[in-house]
Amino acid sequence: MASVRKPSPGWSPIRILRENKTMGKPLLGQMMDVPLLVSSLISHAARHASDTEIVSKRVEGDLHRYTYRDCERRAKQLAQALARLGVETGDRVGTLAWNGYRHLEAYYGIGGMGAVCHTINPRLFPEQIAYIVNHAEDRYVFFDINFAPLVDAIAPQCPHVKGWIAMTDAAHLPSGATPFLCYETLVEAEDGRYDWPRLDEQQASGLCYTSGTTGNPKGVLYSHRSTVLHAYGAALPDAMNLSAMDAVLPVVPMFHVNAWGLPYAVPLTGGKLVLPGKDLDGKSLYELMEAERVTFSAGVPTVWLGLLNYMREAGVRFSTLNRTVIGGSACPPAMLRTFEDEYGVRVIHAWGMTELSPLGTLAKLNWAQSQRPLDAQRRLLEKQGRVICGVDMRIVGDDGRELPWDGVAFGELQVRGPWVIDHYFRGDASPLADGWFPTGDVATIDPDGFLQITDRSKDVIKSGGEWISSIDIENVAIAHPGVAEAACIACAHPKWTERPLLVVVPREGANLTRDTLLAFYEGKVAKWWIPDDVVFVESLPHTATGKLQKLKLRETFRDYVLPTAVCAP
């Protein structure tokens, strides 16, 4: 019988296990057991891109510059401050903030110490934000000073929160009904002599909530391992193709699925980071891109529409920007052609979701596809693209069987991979079906492996890259005493891609008007959720089981033109 080797100094249990494997069992590799941790990304950047700049447009109005070396030092100071406040491993710490250097420090300081960085979308309705903070049981919440009134409104509803930390210095600390802690005071009290703890890579590092399109928002809990692997995948040549030669400006907010992973992927590659803060209008973005010689950006179509409109009116061009990722909602082909033909910027069409960390596919051609006629290339690039390494996808029919990749068959899109959700945070049942995550999207996949989203299995509306719940819109309408029945559907919009149209059956004898009904929404949903228009009808189409036939409604109002005055995020 083979002897069992006893532990000796410096030997880990994993190594002993490898040494003690007997014949007939798998032979494990003998490589270092080093966990994949988010802190390793900022440490790598601080050592190997130490003098590379991080430039931020601050909420206070000025431009802030420092280096990756500075960022890691301050992130460590923040970790020390949080420990002094009593934050422990696994505690959730929220952020209500724009893209800026302090928010980046929170990403690494919170996750690096073993707590969970919970990014919160400030565009949600205050009651939703309060629900999310309470569901996550956040111990502390960081916030940009322009969100002080929002914090004052929700703080009494959030009993778990021990303190609200204003991300500013003492000179700009806002006053309000809530006693605020000062970010800079906390950080400056620490010396930064701190070693990142060696955590389990499966430990949670981040938390994002979905937009609650089918009820209350759901939490998606990312691990250190999933986050680092996603960063590796995002940086690949056939994904975002990031390098130390790039200056990257993420327009997509850091509260929106971790800015599509860029705050992790850019330090991994050592590129320059340019963070735009709250000013996302076309003029502000263009001037910042030009001043900082930005080469790469990422955002939703709505933002790019504003930028292109400004550039046309001002008669200006890009001098350094050469590519941008567009996702969140489908990129209009005309926008893709404008970027490439008029401004020489390559558009990378992408698809993903919160449950995917978020990247799933990106439209990048291989060599053979690049040799096809230009029109054929563009038809591929207008789709949502191919999966990046690490993600697997399939489409299935109503019977659950996998459908062919022929560009014709369409079914429910399902995905799996090391950065795909397994369970929702504090959820009971797993959402997986046979080991796959059902996305709720209906799609086709062509023989080249390019995904195209053709419809949504759930009647949600995506406006400017943000989800709007049709169910919530309908519930408010039905609560009006003059409404007998209501349905909310998506209508095409030239700026926001989609906006809600409310179709209403009035109660007999009710004196109901468009304006009175829309006014009824004030204070009940976020302003940008309020429908753009109301159409009154005698009846709504139903199935034999009494369900609304929204597909028929969408067909009826397919060519409906919404008013030009819209309320959007």
Predicted region positions:
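AMP-dependent adenylate-forming
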Residues: 41-67, 172-174
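Conserved AMP-binding/adenylate-forming core of the ANL superfamily
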Residues: 54-100, 104-108, 125-130, 182-185
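Conserved adenylate-forming
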Residues: 82-87, 190-202, 207-249, 261, ...
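Structural core segment of the AMP-binding/adenylate-forming
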Residues: 84-85, 112-188, 508-510
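AMP-binding/adenylate-forming catalytic core of the ANL superfamily
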Residues: 124, 130, 141-143, 297, ...
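Conserved AMP-binding/adenylation subdomain of ANL enzymes
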Residues: 228-247, 255-295, 310-311, 361
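Gly/Ser/Thr-rich phosphate-binding loop
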Residues: 268, 291-299, 308-379, 392, ...
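Conserved beta-loop-beta connector loops within the AMP-binding
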Residues: 386-414, 447-448, 510-514, 549
